[in-house]
Curated annotation (Swiss-Prot):
L-tyrosine binds at Y37, Y168, Q172, D175, Q190. Belongs to the class-I aminoacyl-tRNA synthetase family. TyrS type 4 subfamily. The gene is tyrS. It comes from the Archaea. The lineage of its organism: Archaea, Methanobacteriati, Methanobacteriota, Thermococci, Thermococcales. This is Tyrosine--tRNA ligase. GO terms for biological process: tyrosyl-tRNA aminoacylation. Homodimer. GO terms for cellular component: cytoplasm. It comes from Pyrococcus abyssi (strain GE5 / Orsay).
Length: 375
């Protein structure tokens, strides 16, 4: 596989942004160690925006010959008050539920979970030189920049927070350098931390990424954030600028069960959630059901996606590209209910191996039902 083919795998849907493609090409060309990482807070049930979006990209990275790693951010979750702010509970959930759920998600998206290294944050945070790296980074970042970066925690600028939360962004940047990560991966909501990492990379004294004497900047790969199924807080949305302002409120949320499908949901739960989903007729710009179709079903194109309908409503129709589907929906040739039902059936089949695993091994879900899920 040549360099351009490997780059195309990194750019493949659901990737939304690479900072930068030129730097990625440079890493391939100089033969730098290719170490990926994606970090997750341990905060509740795994939904499709976490399991399938990250799983899809991990599969792509593996095909491109990149070592893959999942960072189970237990301390970060504690700082951000997840699971009642109980560090021991967070660690138990990380190892007994989250790790298993992500392994199964990677598998259904075509990756090999056996080739993913899982690292618990506390395994490295106990090392003294980790905190040297945190301080080194912090000395190169202003307080106002840190305050603007708290949105990576799902917090709003101006929100009242405890001091520990100001350490969080610098820890997230330190995680990259301390682990020798050359490809930092996350959803678009983590962009601010990754931009800081790129900007400070060549200023660091502790744990810079060095290859053949050159201080390297990490590449940041950001995947699409699936829209939540709920109606947006403002409707209609009249501009792209307005959409950007409320996008954070439109993503899937573990605390709003009907905004998300979880990887273990039953067929009936999936159908019910899709039936209730916001999906206005002819609306193609701000439509969560179409958004899911584009980034899950039509991740690979061409594909075959068949929508079953009674003959009196046009009969079955098969689409091979998302643009075909989008065009028919925009023209009113495809009814929202038919689209919802077809997407639900696709997800039911896709998630079947995960569902069956948890039916055979109920202990992880039993653990989750016993813990306090917060935020």
């Amino acid at each position: 596989m040549d360099i351009e083919e490997r780059i195309n795998l990194v750019l493949k849907k659901p990737t939304e942004e690479v900072l930068t493609v030129e730097n990625l090409r440079h890493l391939f060309e100089v033969g730098a160690p290719l170490q990926h990482y994606i970090g997750f807070e341990i905060s509740g049930y795994i939904h499709l925006g976490t399991g399938l979006m990250a799983g899809a990209k991990i599969a792509d990275f593996q095909k491109a010959g990149i070592k893959t790693r999942i960072f189970l951010a237990d301390w970060h979750s504690w700082i951000n008050d997840k699971l009642g702010g109980d560090l021991e509970v967070i660690q138990e959930v990380a190892l007994k539920y989250f790790k298993v759920g992500m392994e199964k998600s990677i598998e259904v998206m075509g990756g090999d979970p056996k080739k993913v290294e899982f690292v618990l944050a506390s395994e490295i945070l106990e090392n003294g030189d980790y905190w040297q790296t945190v301080i080194d980074i912090s000395k190169n970042v202003t307080l106002s920049r840190v305050m603007r970066s708290i949105t990576i925690m799902g917090r709003q600028m101006g929100e009242s927070i405890d001091f520990a939360k100001l350490i969080y962004p610098m820890m997230q940047v330190a995680d990259i350098f301390y682990q020798g990560v050359t490809i930092a991966h996350a959803g678009m909501d983590q962009r601010k931390a990754h931009v800081i990492a790129i900007e400070v990379a060549q200023k660091l004294k502790y744990h810079p990424i060095v290859h053949n004497g050159e201080k390297l900047k990490p590449v940041a790969v950001h995947h699409h954030l699936l829209l939540g199924l709920q109606e947006p807080p403002v409707w209609p949305i009249t501009s792209e600028e307005q959409f950007k302002e409320i996008k954070a409120q439109m993503k899937m949320s573990k605390s709003k069960p009907y905004s998300a499908v979880f990887i273990h949901d039953s067929p009936e739960e999936i159908k019910q959630k899709l039936r209730k989903a916001f999906c206005p007729a002819r609306e193609v710009n701000y439509n969560p059901v179409l958004d899911w179709a584009e980034h899950i079903i039509f991740r690979e194109e061409p594909t075959e996606f068949t929508i079953h309908r009674p003959a009196k409503f046009g009969g079955d129709v098969t689409y091979t590209t998302f643009e075909e589907l989008k065009k028919d929906f925009a023209e009113g040739k495809l009814h929202p209910l038919d689209l919802k039902n077809a997407v639900a059936e696709y997800l039911i089949e896709l998630l079947k191996p995960i569902r069956e695993y948890f039916e055979r091994h109920p202990e992880p879900l039993e653990l989750m039902r016993s813990v306090k899920i917060t935020r």
